[in-house]
Amino acid sequence: MSMASIASSSSTTLLSSSRVLLPSKSSLLSPTVSFPRIIPSSSASSSSLCSGFSSLGSLTTNRSASRRNFAVKAQADDLPLVGNKAPDFEAEAVFDQEFIKVKLSEYIGKKYVILFFYPLDFTFVCPTEITAFSDRYEEFEKLNTEVLGVSVDSVFSHLAWVQTDRKSGGLGDLNYPLVSDITKSISKSFGVLIPDQGIALRGLFIIDKEGVIQHSTINNLGIGRSVDETMRTLQALQYVQENPDEVCPAGWKPGEKSMKPDPKLSKEYFSAI
């Protein structure tokens, strides 16, 4: 056997072994959380997998449909990527200095949801984000949107924090609930849990009225998020859902010019900038 054949055989063996050693993503998920299975199973043929992208393929095979199909379905099997239904949860929360129950699916058909995760109570960047969202809550309310903050702390910790004055590092009264993810199952289901630390990254998800995740960002622990950008993204999302034949260019804000997703019609936008 030639050296090239031996090398090729060894490479094939290593690749085959590496596939055996890879852990299943589903083993990392909470057993209490269910997800929509959008793509074929791993045993499907490559042709079957390709057929899973039929919604994307229509963008090139059907010109008339392409102008109305710019909200693609995610092809994720496990993690709640954009385009998938948000994992449902029910948990205790603190609102108006009382303990309440929050169930995500109860907002379906009623409101958009801004769901954001933060690492821990009584920390440093976290209160600046939480109070910033609270101070702008009326603006979100006008957009038919609920805000939910989530951390792995208990409801007792949440309560103590809202009962602490802002000038002392507390939150004061908030205009939206703080959810307790003390079992860490919610953070895990949304893919933001740091396993070896047991806390969540700064994940933020915009969920539409159908319960579908339309936007997500995940910041590392030391980087705070922008309420302005969250608001702008929410407004852009609502605009394109109300105007499915249009898309929003970079930095778009309400009242600014949108774009027709068509090679000819888009020239109207580009000629005006």
From Swiss-Prot:
GO molecular function: peroxiredoxin activity; thioredoxin-dependent peroxiredoxin activity
Superkingdom field: Eukaryota
Cellular localization per UniProt: Plastid, Chloroplast
EC identifiers of the protein: 1.11.1.24
Record field: catalytic activity: a hydroperoxide + [thioredoxin]-dithiol = an alcohol + [thioredoxin]-disulfide + H2O
Thioredoxin domain location: 80-239
UniProt keyword Disulfide bond present: yes
Pfam hit, one: AhpC-TSA
InterPro entries xref list: AhpC/TSA (IPR000866), Peroxiredoxin (IPR050217), Peroxiredoxin_C (IPR019479), Thioredoxin-like_sf (IPR036249), Thioredoxin_domain (IPR013766)
Induction description: Down-regulated by ascorbate.
Coiled coil: none
Keywords: Antioxidant, Chloroplast, Disulfide bond, Oxidoreductase, Peroxidase, Plastid, Redox-active center, Transit peptide
A GO biological process held by the record: cell redox homeostasis
Transit peptide start-stop: 1-72
Gene Ontology CC terms, in alphabetical order: apoplast; chloroplast; chloroplast stroma; plasma membrane; stromule
Residues of the active site: 126
Main EC class the enzyme belongs to: oxidoreductase
Miscellaneous comment text of the record: The active site is a conserved redox-active cysteine residue, the peroxidatic cysteine (C(P)), which makes the nucleophilic attack on the peroxide substrate. The peroxide oxidizes the C(P)-SH to cysteine sulfenic acid (C(P)-SOH), which then reacts with another cysteine residue, the resolving cysteine (C(R)), to form a disulfide bridge. The disulfide is subsequently reduced by an appropriate electron donor to complete the catalytic cycle. In this typical 2-Cys peroxiredoxin, C(R) is provided by the other dimeric subunit to form an intersubunit disulfide.
Family recorded in the similarity comment: Belongs to the peroxiredoxin family. AhpC/Prx1 subfamily.
Protein function: Thiol-specific peroxidase that catalyzes the reduction of hydrogen peroxide and organic hydroperoxides to water and alcohols, respectively. Plays a role in cell protection against oxidative stress by detoxifying peroxides. May be an antioxidant enzyme particularly in the developing shoot and photosynthesizing leaf.
Subunit record text: Homodimer; disulfide-linked, upon oxidation. Interacts with the plastidial thioredoxin CDSP32. Interacts with the plastidial NADPH-dependent thioredoxin reductase ANTR-C.
Listed name of the protein: 2-Cys peroxiredoxin BAS1-like, chloroplastic
Species name: Arabidopsis thaliana
Lineage: Eukaryota, Viridiplantae, Streptophyta, Embryophyta, Tracheophyta
